[in-house]
Amino acid sequence: MSQQYSYGGGGGAGYPPPQMQPPNSYAQANYQGQPQGAQNQYYNGQQPHHNAPQQYYGNDYKQPLKPEGFEGERLQPKPKFRDPIFLVLFLLVFAGFIALSVICLRSYSNADVNVSIGRANVAGSTLNGHTAIMFMICCAVALVLSFVYILLVRTFPKIILEATLLLTTLSNVAFCVYLWVRGNTAAAIIFTIFAVLSVIAYFFMRKRIPLAKLILVTVIRTAEQYKSVYVVALGGLIVETAFSAWTSWVVVAAYQRFEPSGQAAGSSSSNASIIGIMVFIVFAYYWISEVIKNIAFTTVAGIFGVAYYNANKVANAAWGAFRRSMTYSLGSICFGSLIVAILDLLRALFNILQSQAASDGDMTGQILACVAGCCVSCIQGLVDYFNRYAYINIALYGNGYITAAKETWALLKDRGIDAIINDSLVNIVFNCGAFIIGLLTALFAFIYEQLTNPRYLQNDAGYYSIVLLVAFGLGFNIALSVGAGSIASGVSTYFVALAEDPYILQGKNPELFEMIRQQYPQVVQGVNH
């Protein structure tokens, strides 16, 4: 009778822990993979008939993602709260955001500020209920566009890959041309370099599209088997949308309550107060939004981990992954999200400084702010890239954030998967899609404001930048939560699982395994410690 292995939230026959030694070399033409007995061990659930297991990684028998001191099974770690300090800090910030919301919204409600949908010439000299309702409609628009986009990705993966890669390159070139036409020399020089690099990258990455398409289709098929992937992504999207709408009202109410010209202004209203309040709101929004997205990401990563390591479908995989993300691993998620939130805040600050320097005609300040903003953006990109695989480690083992990041990064480098990740086009699909949806949402906001022509825009056209920036941010965040929370999460999880045990993929999808072996032969070689 075959032995069963369960790495998920329920029963079912799975694959035994990897303990075999991969072959050291492969013939290009007649490669057959593992010995038949080893494949039977994996795919029929049979134990090997030798006295001692072969060593798979190094001189110990620990699984490659398994950190030092790990206790428990894969996807079923020993219950222990990780990084509790950051969980406490997050709860304090969240409580502060709730308290500020109550204060602002109560004052806003008591002041009886005019609220209307589509009404022209709305009274008031600052953002008001008209703006908040418009932001809520923007959230609904972004929600619909996100569903349409993910449906297109599921239906036309190759076309979407081709189109997004081309659009990304063309948008970089177009933005560069726009900066030169506008006379923004400092930013134009920097983005010219980016545009040239993007054109070079386009021709280099285009030949990787067949592999990216195959990976994308494989993950989508897995998601069809575990439909809870879409349920979790939808749940995260709804929570993200609701929180974005909540924040929209808080932003408007804060302006009305703390700006001297607001209709609900009190004794504590001042320019300094509104600046401090808005900094806190923006920071809290970034952090809480990141936590929401990363909870969904970690949960979906756990589901895909269960799917990869188990031969049969596992029941309650989503609930087990979600429970761990919301309890023992929440502190680690808050830790990683805090780093990104701080970088988001710094990037927004440098963008404001650059705009102010441009309006003042300060070329030196504009250049410095632009360079600083670009540096922060680059660092943020690296952190985002790093965090994805740390969260996957957390999903698989419930590890602490720092240890998870170090363990996963070391494994990815040693297994050669970093080459695949760098060449992967899948993330471009969802990043580009989120950017396009953000632009369309901002365009909707612009048309809406043009048609309604509220009074605060008549008094100060500078509010257009605030409205469009918030609308773009809402659309971008909502769309990104869909892509990063479902298919892209599965792609990243499969990369990590492939690094740990590529032979499971060989049995489940020989075509994908063979393509990866041909382009990245180091992936199916043993790890040297």
From Swiss-Prot:
Its cellular-component GO annotations read: membrane; plasma membrane
Q: Where is this region: Disordered?
A: 1-58
Describe its membrane topology.
Answer: Multi-pass membrane protein
| Composition-biased stretches (Low complexity) | 22-48
Cytoplasmic topological domain ranges are: 1-84, 154-158, 206-230, 293-294, 347-362, 449-464
What domain of life?
Answer: Eukaryota
Q: Which GO terms describe its molecular function?
A: transmembrane transporter activity
**Keywords from the named record:** Cell membrane, Glycoprotein, Membrane, Transmembrane, Transmembrane helix, Transport
Where do transmembrane segments lie in this chain?
85-105, 133-153, 159-179, 185-205, 231-251, 272-292, 295-315, 326-346, 363-383, 428-448, 465-485
Per the record, a Pfam family? Choline_transpo
Q: Which residues are glycosylated?
A: 114, 271, 422
Q: Name one GO biological process term.
A: transmembrane transport
* Membrane topology, Extracellular segments: 106-132, 180-184, 252-271, 316-325, 384-427, 486-529
Q: Where in the cell is it found?
A: Cell membrane
Concerning InterPro entries, the annotation shows:
Choline_transptr-like (IPR007603)
Recorded family membership: Belongs to the CTL (choline transporter-like) family.
Described by its record, this protein's role is as follows: Probably involved in transport through the plasma membrane.
- Protein name, please? Protein PNS1
Q: What is the protein's species of origin?
A: Mycosarcoma maydis
Question: Gene encoding this polypeptide?
Answer: PNS1
